[in-house]
Amino acid sequence: MSMKQIKNKPNRSAFDLSLRKCFTAKVGEILPVFMKECIPGDKFKFGLNSFTRTMPVNSAAYTRIKEYYDYFFVPYRLLWRYFDQFVTDTQASNPQFALSLTQSSSSVAARTPYIVASNVATYLNNSSSAGLKNEFGFNRALLSYKLLKYLGYGLFSASSSNQFTAGNSAIMLNAFPLLAYQKICQDYFRNTQWEKANPTTYNVDYLNGVSTKIDITPLLSTSAKNNRNLFDLNYCTWNKDLFTGLLPAPQYGDTAYIQTGQNQNVSFDNGEFSADLSSGVVEFDVDSNSNSSGLVNANTLLRGSAGLGKTDSSNVTGKFRLTNDEFSSFSVLALRQAEALQKWKEVSLSGKQDYKDQIEKHFGVSVPDVRSNLCTWIGGQVGVLDIGEVVNTNLQGINENKNVSADIAGRGVGSMSGRDEFTCSEHGIVMCLYHAVPLMDYEDTVTDLFMFKGSRYDYAIPEFDSVGMQSVPALALNPEFQTNLPIPDNSTGQANLTTDFYKSLGYAPRYVDYKTSVDVVTGAFTRSLAYWAAPMSTDYFQSLFSAISNGQKLTPAFFKCNPSILDTIFAVNADASMDTDNLLVSCYNDIKAVRNLDYNGLPY
């Protein structure tokens, strides 16, 4: 007898979840401005209307800023893999995970992962007193407090001396909003080529027992203080250009090589070195103090004209390389294999390092987000924040020549609207994140790549266009990054720009200077009129990346938008405090949802 037809028939009703949120922001910050829980069967219609003003600008600055709103869906199972069993209460009869070879995970706690308010306040206070800073030198505790407030953890408060308290210190708070925010930032706002994934910020699969309390005590240890965690506010990356689009290596992993020989056993007979000469490389391992029969003095081999010049008595390992062409040759098949391996490595590095993107890169198949354990991007809106002029010609501006002096200040205004839809098939959270990014300008200390050309091979040659990436010299971005550079010798015809002659910032497509340009600010805008523009300056680079002069690579912070970039155009410099926010935003989320719930919640 089948019970297939026995199903619950839930009521389905429409609900208005619209709300307005007024908030302040800085450029670069990724801020949650809307969040709602989802249940299976939900159908959402998102409408967005946003209006932004800026704090007073020092001038009618030639700075361009874009605003972004993005909606995401984060399934709970990506944050805590036991959620499906938890919500259906089937862990006893249908366990899904094993704890060991002989034990199933048959018990799941009675509540979802949580944090204790008093523990969070303790963490914030300890972080503040320890002076912990983020990658831009801002107080991490204040930024964590801001994130908690924007997510809706309203019971936390901060004093003027940056001391934090919780309204009900013993209350247990759901951790899913924090984890979902970090999951979105890891999936969509991380430069995957330069920054490794950090699942510890969003995943709590380790909570598989009776308790689901997230113990944040380890975050206070010395070893963990400098690591990012679930309380950290994140920053978006710059839009990609010549420098922010660089890759850390010309391919994924090491360069592919063709092996021209193999290891062989070595034997000694009456003091003479002998080996199987069927390959081009012979390896040996000799104890120089060996008393083996037939080997009177190994030093003769190690120090002789045909040896390695070994001078001590320790064990040695080395190679005798045969120069016979017969032994050093390789097959065309080996060349094909090396080329295929190199191609695979270069294609792998060109995209994100998750399953979805890698399969699309190599197989040309679009894989659903679920196969890469990614949260889902629903949609979003983009707007432009324009800075216009405000001219003051009142009598207080009369100068000594009895002429009216007009002061030109500025104000920024932006607006946008749009609509998106989404149908939910599992439990999770819908979250909208806001961020604003200036379009990058560089100070005139940036050197055009053309200036580094010397050899004929530095100029574009179509035959060499597809041989791989080229390095971008650090000197092109900042003259302080390389002060002791030898004068290039072009007598040999060796290319300088398209090789690693210069210390490298990273790698870009070959002949990249023919394929893109960067925006530059020069003249008085870099000196007396600096408040009219907000370029990436020498001081900005040097404060963050002085280590590059020692040959080190860029850090992930280089690719993130620093709120301090606009300090020149605003009267107040950016710091960790919300009081220095310079974007004033009013956002109306027109949200309609159809859900498997009754409108009144009554049985009649």
What annotation goes with each model-predicted range?
Residues M1-Y604:
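Intrinsically disordered, low-complexity segments
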